[in-house]
Amino acid sequence: MDNENPAHAGWRLARENPKLVLLEVAWRWSFGILALLLLGWAVASVLHRVTISDADWVALRSLDLHDTPYTLAKIIILFWQDLLLVFATLLSALALAWMITATWGRAATLRILEGRSNTPAVAGLNLLRVLLFIVTLLAAVFAVEGAVWLSTPSAADPAELNWALYLLIVLIALPLIMIAWGILNWVLSLAPLFAVREQKGAFASLAAAFRSLRCNRKVYWSVSGVYGLYRGAALVALTVMGLLLAVLSQSKIVLGLLLALLLLYFAFADLLYVARLAAYLQIVEGQLPALQLPAAS
């Protein structure tokens, strides 16, 4: 297996270690269940704090292109303080839940692959991912608000918004922000491999991840492309089967089948994630000596 490429090696390791997949499913689905419970709490809290009239309920349920957005905007404007408090609490709780489950899950999977772990460094890297998400969210909000400000000729009359300029700014700024977030988040997800192998802290592991990407970017992109293609094909298959089932019938049985297909897709996506992680580990193991910084003389 010396000539085995990283993508094939990762797939083989995932198949030979079903416990890896079970651990990945366990932590991701645990977070998913916690997220649903927290979302349910947020909805209940909003309904308790916000008074919605019968007419507003009718407008919200109608899904009318004019009445529904108008009613929703009116509710947000009237109760923005309560909604902001609930949103901030929900976001904080989700971040904490994700940090705990993700740190436990990644430390456990790497312990199987490497025989050891580095939980403090993994937790630090996950904290950086949470902070990156918050910064990205704020950047998106500022981009939208900045687009409104730049597209309004007169501050006294916001109705004079230049929609063409507004859309141009938003459609350029938001994709750039998302691309930057995607790249940095991916590097942060790669860094735990170096935290475990080199037993270093979060920032040293992050620096090692950047060095590895600089030396082996083609191999990393190749592995990511292979598993991205698999996941894309699975998503297309899920969409096609879901549409076919929806066209054939709208019974509860079909709804149950759709839910089962969705869960199957999530499980397959977790399998692919573990295989990709193992493939990245093969790259790291093959290049580790070249990544060490020279000792200071």
Located regions from the model:
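Juxtamembrane transition segments at transmembrane-helix termini in multipass membrane proteins
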Residues: 2-9, 15, 19, 23-78, ...
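Hydrophobic alpha-helical transmembrane segments of membrane proteins
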Residues: 93-104, 108, 270, 274
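Non-cytosolic segments of integral membrane proteins
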Residues: 139-160
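Alpha-helical membrane-spanning segments of integral membrane proteins, especially the hydrophobic core
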Residues: 79-95, 115-141, 162-177
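Hydrophobic alpha-helical transmembrane segments of integral membrane proteins
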Residues: 101-103, 107-142, 211-230
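Cytosolic-side membrane-entry/anchor segment at the start of a transmembrane helix
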Residues: 13, 17-29, 34-41, 114-144
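Residue-identity detector for threonine
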Residues: 51, 68-71, 89, 101-103, ...
